[in-house]
Amino acid sequence: MSQSNSHGQSNLAKFAFNIYGTLSTNSSTPQSHEISPSSSLSSSRSKKQTSQYNTQDTNNNRLSYYCDKEIISLSQLNCSLSIGGYSGDLQHHVVIGGKNYLRLLCVSESQQRIISGINLLESKSIYNSRAPNKLINVNTIKTFADTIATGLSNGVVSIYKISPNGQSKVTGKYSDHNRTINSLDFIESENQLLSGSQDGTIKLWDLRSSSTKPVMTVQANLHSDPIRACQYSPHSAVRNKICVLSVHDSGALCKFDLRTKSGGKVYSPEKKWNLHTGPALSLHIHPEKELVVTGGRDKRISIFNYGERQSRNTPQNLINTYGPVVKVRWSTYTNTEETAEEFEENKQAKPNTLYNYDIACSYLNDDPTITIYNLGRKFIPKQIIHSKKPIQNFIWARNETRSRKIWTISKSSTFSSYNLDRLEDSDVSRPIEDLNNIAMTWDNNNDFCAVSQARYDYDLETYENGINETTEENFDAERNYSLGNEELIHSQANSLTASPVDKPQLTRSLTFNPASSFSTFSPVLVARAATGFLQNDSATSSSSIPNMQVSSSRPKLTRNTSQTTQDSSSSQFASVLPPPSASQTYSSPQYKKNNPPRFMNNPAYVIPVSIPIPANDEYVFRKLSSESLVSTPDGFTLVDVCLLNASVAASVGNNRTSQIWRLLAVSIQEEFESGIEPRRIYAFQPEAINKLPQDVQETSTNANDTLHAETTNSNFVESFKSTSTSGSQFGKQSDKDERKLQSKNSSGNLMDMINKANRTNSFSATSFKFKEQERKEDESQKAQSIKDENERASIHSKSAPISISSHPEDLDDENMGSNNSAALKFSPPSVGVSIPSTRIISSSLASSPKSVRGPSGVKSHISRSRPSPPVQTWLKQKNLEVSNGSAMASTSGLSLTLKRNKTNEEGDQLTKAWKFKSLLRKSLDYATLQGDIIFCSTAALLFYDIVPEIISQFECLEWLGIYIEVLQRKRLFVNAINVIKCATADIQEKLQKLYCQDLSLRFYCSNCQALLVNEKSKFSGKGEFGYWYCDECSKLQSQCVYCNEPCKGLAVTVGLKCGHHGHFGCLKEWFIEDQNTECPGGCGYQII
């Protein structure tokens, strides 16, 4: 029965391979000529193997494999295997482990497809297990030749042997650890194995022995300090010394010597260094030197020299990352195979081994990236791998082409391969390619520094081969490359009179002062090439400037605005530099003869600039950030908050900002608090004039036959209004109603101010038609029809339309057009303007100014003009609306004229330019251009939840993020926290993730600069434990400036400038009781 089952499985596998070979052209699946139909699978291979081949993804020639269970660990097996049916010799394979999962994937020579998969959990074993289906968790994997060692979560170490035909066998199981095994490593051969566990011990196993007990147990302390990683060092300078390094949860790096005589147990390391303030999670030893790289939860990567002759206790290099580092690894191969275009080198390895190898690291907290650094430029990642899912583990992969490949496994149970040498891979970014050569930043004192650095100016040390000579032909070629058609530059550079003035080299101890520079010729921008071509030797040129280094590997920095640099040492030799290179330095034979090879350090040009900008006043910024309201207190409205912010801005002299806040307050009151719907203005339709009723036109014409036709027809409403306001009780009552309406609603004041400012330009012959939408929709149908009929009756086809206002005072003011027309008799028809009745109008054509309420021409004009009954009915209706408080504010003819061109032919609705949303958007745009971060942030905090369509979430986060950074830089931490507290819920959640994280405080000794951990006295029980002393140098850290006693716990600092501090009680006695104003340390610092 078993034979028939195995025969059926074999036939199924043959059939599946035939399908994949004939139906698929994908390079990741086996082809028909690679696996024959008669190929067979081992019985240890999974029954689900054939179904998993379909999940292989080879987009962009990337190897990908999906696992059906959760995977945690990853390693590479480098041994020769012969898979049945495949003619090639497979050398590099993938080993993946996880929860009840352990599989060996055989990869092709090109590492672009998976040939076969072997389930190692079904391997033959010499150990008889009563629970074959027991759940295991493979936490770590280590390989050596044909041996695979796995560390399980239950503290068991399992050893697998792989035969050349792909068969696997369990050869050993060792269980002496009490907790999870975190790290494994072989010692020079497959017979000795190291295991580091969470129980704080490192055990050495002899795999040739039949005993299941460890040969040696190593422990860092008497108490258990969990071991995160351990590794054997093959670079020991002492013969036969077995050196092992380990990192612990305490952040310590320990060095052990396994040549012990203490009976196989070591309880203290040979050396110990505290490199991290939190748990150290990973380590990896350099492939060539006694250097180790460690990564920890403190977001730091430390490169430390653990050699015998070194005595320093601090890392040799530090890399600050953007997340907690869970794994860090040196690259397998050097960078000698990289292209010359990327590093501006001719495939020559750097002599410093630190720069030959890259460093890759992955992060905690579900970060989907892997960052690659190089110590040649450690502050900027060299490459970043972006994955769709969080990265679980990774390794540098060995391959036949010695290319830089990284294998990864993600939390989505997917194995992927990334080739860092392929430029077309979209998931691998190169941040250095996107950086600008010039950058600028501000400091705490409102000064800024500009940095100018070429892209490939690595911070490299000297080359061992010295400085190479350059022939005359190379100089000619370089001149042609850098100059091209610049004959003007070439001609001026070859004359002594036009040579540039020598400038001293920029150093970090001096401040660059552009005002003291000489006027020099600024050539056209070329690729940072020197322009000196003087071939004459001049002793005064180089000797006049002290400390001049003529052989700088980078051209001197000029003091003009051009980025082209000029070499001031042209009297010694002539050179033109191509784009800056880290591997070549051009010099003359004379210079090489007189100067030996020296260090080639290419620092960036840092230019500190101090400009007294009035807007950067410290007092103004502090007052505005502290007193401006960013939220609405209880009992206040938005209008009150805007007015208070306006007063704060006015108190520091920011008058424009103050006026903007007041304008926003008026617009808020008009739109949100007045309760009046906004007026809607529609474009005038000329054909509506021809459709007016004939009886309305005849009535209006007969009522005004005693005056000139044009004057009377255009101003008969104003004449009637003047009669009513001068002699009737109705006019007096309308004045009272108008004043009540104006006191109730302030929105009309804004319109009147606009009309007053533009009254002299409000006369126009353009026709307009008004359609007013009333606020109350429950009016009777009869009143509505009467109003519409009277509106149409007020328009004449042969004259300009009449601007009818709901304010009696405005109608009285518009009579000014009638007076002028009656006096001049030939003036053109006009449109009424809202002008206060107490004003005196002066016309440029009249002989003297005339009062609007003057009795002389007004009464005679009114006595000859009476409005028609339809007009009286319309006016009564409008005055009734005024008394009820439901009238609309009038709109001047100037506003309509300005908006006339903004309407389309369909008559779309227009929006007021002084609306709140429009004013807010314009104010924010202007403040953004001016760099007013306080106004932008304050407005975003106040109005983001009110008008989210005006202030986007991206803008709000950007403004508030910059504002918080500036506040923290200026040490205004209370204001920064207040900004976060006043933000809306969605914004506050994102800001807290960025700016409210836990602080990591590191204390260093002020004498020996060692990290204060004081582990020697921590468990001794002698005295009070703390960080006010140092175990390394046995010196006190801080003493009270008043009583000269140690400051244990809380200490008060006198001032940030002097730095003296002391006990709270001592300083209270000195300053408050004794009423002293100077620092008790004698530095002369005044606190008041």
Curated annotation (Swiss-Prot):
Subcellular localization is given as:
Vacuole
Q: Give me the stretches of Basic and acidic residues compositional bias.
A: 769-794
Q: Any idea which UniProt keywords this protein has?
A: Metal-binding, Repeat, Vacuole, WD repeat, Zinc, Zinc-finger
Q: Which GO terms describe its molecular function?
A: zinc ion binding
Q: Where is the composition biased (Low complexity)?
A: 27-44, 561-572
Q: Where in this protein does the record put region Disordered?
A: 26-56, 537-597, 709-751, 764-829, 844-871
GO annotations under biological process? positive regulation of macroautophagy; positive regulation of TORC1 signaling
InterPro entries assigned to the protein according to its UniProt record, in alphabetical order: WD40/YVTN_repeat-like_dom_sf (IPR015943), WD40_repeat_CS (IPR019775), WD40_repeat_dom_sf (IPR036322), WD40_rpt (IPR001680), WDR24 (IPR037590), WDR59_RTC1-like_RING_Znf (IPR049566), Znf_RING (IPR001841)
The RING-type zinc-finger regions cover 1040-1083
Hey, which family's this protein in? Belongs to the WD repeat RTC1 family.
State what protein this is by name. Answer: Restriction of telomere capping protein 1
Organism, by scientific name, is: Candida albicans (strain SC5314 / ATCC MYA-2876) (Yeast)
Gene name on record?
RTC1
